[in-house]
């Protein structure tokens, strides 16, 4: 990932000399992602996390890591999104996927710059099952009348019974389903290739984050709950 830390904030960036992350699979898409876990199979295998393409294979061997993989709790982010039409910023929670079926995703917040105006924005939130047969697709964009280019809080409450989504402490939606396994966090900024010679705005592109916090519910063991974020470019 490309990032800087200063003034008490994390600045997750897409920079001018940054190469596309996987040209054979995603063309010219660039991404910076901080994640709190890493799991993959042997070199050349198709075993890995958050599969983006059926042709994806393990190209580099890395040590598997669990830095912060909570199982239920509250996750909260305070951040500024971007109005850049070529970009998307997000905080996702995904299954660690040491078992393929443990692959569901909780999307805490996902914001495309093309959906941002000074008066309002569409904020994506919900659950994607992927290969988890116990979950069903329930994802939507909620239009909120705030300027997401300023700091706001995006929160998910994750219990055995439900997943609830909040913006600035206000409930947006609640789902009666819940992944029942540890999940890692994925903090991302994407720059999508555009049908024009130059990007919509000059690089670097920015996703400024004040904090990401996790709260453990009473009675839950502390194993796999402490650590710091891992970076992937």
Task: Go through the PLM ranges and name each one.
Residues 1-233:
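GH16 jelly-roll
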């Amino acid at each position: 990932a490309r990032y800087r830390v200063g003034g008490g904030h994390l600045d997750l960036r897409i920079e001018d000399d940054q190469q596309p992350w996987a040209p054979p699979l995603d063309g010219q898409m660039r991404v910076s992602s901080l994640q709190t876990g890493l799991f993959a199979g042997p070199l050349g295998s198709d075993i890995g996390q958050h599969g983006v393409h059926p042709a994806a294979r393990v190209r580099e061997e890395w040590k598997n890591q669990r830095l912060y993989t909570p199982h239920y709790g509250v996750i909260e982010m305070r951040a500024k999104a971007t109005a850049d039409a070529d970009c998307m910023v997000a905080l996702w929670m995904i299954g660690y996927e040491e078992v393929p079926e443990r692959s569901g995703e909780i999307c805490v917040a996902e914001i495309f710059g093309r959906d941002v105006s000074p008066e309002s924005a569409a904020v994506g939130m919900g659950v994607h099952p992927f290969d988890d047969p116990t979950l069903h697709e329930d994802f939507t964009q909620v239009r909120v009348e705030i300027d997401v280019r300023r700091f706001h809080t995006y929160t998910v409450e994750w219990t055995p019974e439900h997943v609830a989504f909040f913006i600035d402490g206000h409930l947006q939606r609640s789902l009666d389903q819940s992944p029942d396994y540890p999940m890692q966090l994925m903090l991302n900024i994407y720059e999508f290739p555009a049908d024009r010679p130059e990007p919509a705005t000059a690089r670097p592109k920015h996703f400024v984050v004040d904090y990401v916090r996790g709260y453990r519910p009473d009675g839950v063991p502390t194993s796999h709950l402490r650590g710091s974020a891992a970076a992937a470019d």
